[in-house]
Amino acid sequence: VKECDITKLKKVASEDVLSGMDLEKMEKELSQYTEEEYGKVFVDETNKFKKAIFKDLFTDIKIKDIKADGDKTTVKVTGKQKDYSQVSFDQSELNTTAQQYVEEHQDELAKVYKEEGLSAYQIKVYDGIAPILYQSMTETYKSAPTEKLTATFTLEKKNDKWIITGIDE
């Protein structure tokens, strides 16, 4: 989870577990902003932000108990988790920030559009708003409440690999 690598998570957790955690949804919402059309600065800021929120999602994790029974094992863990349920990563904040930026930098952006075209204009906007947008979003996610986590993970051996098949909180 800390690496924000859904592909790796899919190798160790069942689809039911992943869908219940909403990690894939969060990652997908943010990954839409890593396309080339957004420009290098915006993509880099998006990736940095994405890694930061996934890194802070679960902290102070401690294994409290392990019970093995053949091809099934349960692991009880405690720790802390951020509650991002009220934090939105949708396009509305992006649109609002972009609109404000365009209004404040009309002359400069008009020149870029005239001399370099629409694509350069859009990248200039994204480059300009990236620090503003991600600073605001960072403050929002850092202020998200931290909750105590107590969970029991169920792991099952399938095809010689241990897969997380359940999480009970």
Region annotations inferred by a language model:
Residues 79-85, 157:
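Beta-strand elements of well-folded, non-transmembrane domains
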Residues 93-124, 141-169:
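Short beta-strand edge/turn micro-motifs at domain boundaries
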